[in-house]
Design a protein with these regions (language model features):
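Basic, helix-initiating cap at the start of DNA-binding domains
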Residues: 2-50, 54-66, 80
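C-terminal peripheral helix-coil segments that are non-catalytic and often amphipathic
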Residues: 2-29, 109, 113-120, 155-171, ...
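Alpha-helical structural segments
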Residues: 34, 38-45, 49, 63, ...
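Short coil/turn segments at alpha/beta junctions that flank glycine-rich nucleotide-binding fingerprints
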Residues: 49-53, 104, 125-128, 171
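Short hydrophobic/aromatic patch on the recognition helix
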Residues: 65-75
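Amphipathic alpha-helical segments used for helix-helix packing
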Residues: 110, 124-145
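Membrane-interface starts of transmembrane alpha-helices
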Residues: 176, 180-184
Length: 230
């Protein structure tokens, strides 16, 4: 039988976007699957805070209350556990960033809401902050599997924003000259950069400045002029 790829589900970064973390593991699970889920849930904050290299076996044993054999009977090794922990952390971040977005009919308002969610939730709902930033920085010259996972997560986020922008252009809410992907990359880069500065300086002001600047740009340069009076 062919071994399934890493992940508690067949995770597609282009489609996993509108579901809560509870739905992430939806379905009837065996006792072993429940244990595996619980290990991932408890390991996720460790990997997000300490990184792949910094998370030791003793850390995992302390967090899960299991011995080495009890942990790795469910995973092929530390890399698989770290990958599934990233999936879990990223899905929680995605769920938070999309909160309330679908309720807004206007495309620019949707983009602004995602900016607000990022800033207000500090980019993630797992201790340690944004799992994408944390994993990308650590894995840049390190673990290839985790780096590829982070790259796919980034692409899914870019695609999500791009779809909103493209829909706005189609509905004449956004100027047709706007390039959805470039706009999406700029928004993400602004937020992640501001988050990095805020974390280093232990000051949330850079994030709030980024929010203000992004909102202003979206209203002045992205929202189509005729749509402003609606």
């Amino acid at each position: 039988m062919r071994k399934r790829p890493f992940g508690l589900i067949n995770l597609s970064y282009t489609t996993v976007r509108d579901h809560s973390v509870s739905e992430y593991w939806e379905g009837v699970m065996t006792k072993g699957q429940e244990t595996k889920q619980e290990i991932v849930r408890k390991a996720a904050p460790l990997f997000n805070q300490k990184g792949y290299a910094g998370t030791s076996l003793s850390d995992l044993m302390d967090a899960t209350g299991l011995q080495k054999g009890g942990i790795y009977r469910h995973f092929s090794g530390k890399e698989e556990l770290a990958t599934e922990a990233f999936d879990y952390s990223w899905q929680k971040a995605v769920t938070g960033r999309l909160e309330g977005v679908e309720n807004l009919p206007d495309s620019v308002d949707r983009l602004k809401k995602m900016v607000d969610n990022f800033v207000d939730m500090r980019a993630g709902l797992v201790p340690g902050g944004c799992p994408l930033m944390n994993t990308a920085i650590e894995a840049d010259d390190g673990n290839t599997v985790l780096r590829n996972r982070a790259r796919k997560a980034l692409q899914s986020w870019i695609k999500r924003l791009s779809r909103i922008a493209a829909a706005g252009i189609h509905k004449h809410e956004i100027y047709s000259r706007i390039e959805p992907r470039k706009l999406s990359e700029w928004i993400i880069g602004s937020l992640e950069g501001a988050l990095l500065i805020s974390r280093l300086q232990k000051d949330s002001e850079p994030l709030h400045n980024a929010r203000r600047n992004l909102h202003e740009y979206l209203e002045r340069n992205v929202r189509a002029k005729h749509a402003r009076s609606k």
